[in-house]
Amino acid sequence: DDKGNADPSKMGEIVSLLESIKGYDLADRMRDNFISSMQLASPEIMFSVRYLAPNTTHSMDLYYAAWTTCGVTRDLVDAFECTDGQKWGESPLTVPVNESLLATGELGDANKAERAKLFQNRDRRLYETVCHSGEADFSMDGQEGGSVTITNQMQTGFGMMKLIQPTKEMPSYSTISDADVIILRYAEVLMMIAEAENEANGPTQKVYDAVNQIRVRSGQPELPAGLTKDQMRERIRNEWRVEFVFEGHRYFQLKRWKLMDKLVNGASDPALPTYVKVFKPAFYYFPLPQSEIDKAGGVLVQDPNYK
């Protein structure tokens, strides 16, 4: 509805429809779905836009690695739990950091060492999703050697790891990228089951089973028993966030949940304090194009929130 609440009467039908989907499973690792050489065999990918070198390629490695056109905020890094399932900063596994060294995009040794502390004792998906200080560690993908320098610039000190292919050198104009772009994977089906079932009936075992499959895959503990419906909703929403980073879901989910004005408006990053996000209530809806209003001869009137 206009407050972001789900209609419980419709959720049961949605769950039944989602449970009728057969023939798919989770890949061994979340990141396996995004490595070009492993995508064709992935049991998780349901729909994707296919690429195949040398005729059909793109430049995501150049854009997201060398050029760092997709910045990563500290707020996103903090969204990933520690390995005990507790929030970073609340978990006893939290490694204290010098915030003054983190509030900058500088790539010096001291800054790098401090950022590395944020990556200790964390959900494995953080390592599969985010890199820092201009380097990426592809050893998890079976590549020998240590970290690889993939860029000489990161405005916040953090960058994308998830969609970058394993490499031994910084991507350049000659880098050919042909990883498929995923539209839908089975993990999303499980998350939709969990969200719809929780809205319909609260945190039933069906909700726990769906979410825990994804959590256990990443090495995280199962969700604690006894969560309320509201608590489960918050856990589900964070699970959506950390599992599907850079896959095009977050913006539309925050609009669907009517949380853009609460979580996005006024948001900034410590490394870029002069850049502050603005989101007005009117932005939940698209304005009528002025050209269409002009052609309608007075029949169409602009949303008053845009006036």
Language-model region placement:
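Helix-capping and short linker residues that terminate individual alpha-solenoid repeat units
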Residues: 24-26, 219-220
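Aromatic-rich beta-strand patches that line glycan-recognition/binding surfaces
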Residues: 25, 29-31, 143-145
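Extended, hydrophobic/aromatic-rich amphipathic alpha-helical segments that build helical scaffolds
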Residues: 1-21, 47, 118-131, 181-214, ...
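Flexible, polar/acidic helix-loop-strand segments at domain edges
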Residues: 43-44, 104-186
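Long, intrinsically disordered, low-complexity segments
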Residues: 5-6, 19-21, 31-91, 176-183, ...
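N-terminal non-cleavable signal-anchor helices
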Residues: 16, 28, 36, 149-151
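Surface-exposed intrinsically disordered loops and tails
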Residues: 2-14, 89-110
